[in-house]
Amino acid sequence: MQPGGAPDMSALLAQAQQMQQQLMAAQQEMAQAEVTGQAGGGLVVATVKGTGEVVGLQIDPKVVDPEDVETLQDLVIGAIEDASRKAQEVAAEKLGPLAGGLGGGLPGLPGF
């Protein structure tokens, strides 16, 4: 802070720019990260990018039963949900420290 309690705007701007760069780097890491989720003890495995995009699905032939399509559908949904949950955990892990840095806002600027 400068004399009189006014915030040092150049320091605040530098801090904001640094946080923006860190956020962009974390977002890039998330976009490249892939996580897998499974259901049925690994009979169905889904691969999801950190962005939530489903990029892979493996189904063990043992679980394919034309007489019981509903079970296969449930397993696919379960595997995708598991992978999506893990992708959200990765996002929280990568973005959490940055969000914590924003928790106090920008000192000296109300509403930020």
UniProtKB/Swiss-Prot annotation:
The keyword Cytoplasm applies. It is found in: Cytoplasm, Nucleoid. One of its GO terms (molecular function) is DNA binding. Coiled coil: none annotated. Its main location: cytoplasm. SUPFAM superfamilies: YbaB-like. Signal peptide: none annotated. Gene3D superfamilies: Nucleoid-associated protein YbaB-like domain. One of its GO terms (cellular component) is cytosol. Keywords: Cytoplasm, DNA-binding. Belongs to the YbaB/EbfC family. NCBIfam families: DNA_YbaB_EbfC. Binds to DNA and alters its conformation. May be involved in regulation of gene expression, nucleoid organization and DNA protection. Homodimer. This is Nucleoid-associated protein RER_03900. It comes from Rhodococcus erythropolis (strain PR4 / NBRC 100887). The lineage of its organism: Bacteria, Bacillati, Actinomycetota, Actinomycetes, Mycobacteriales.
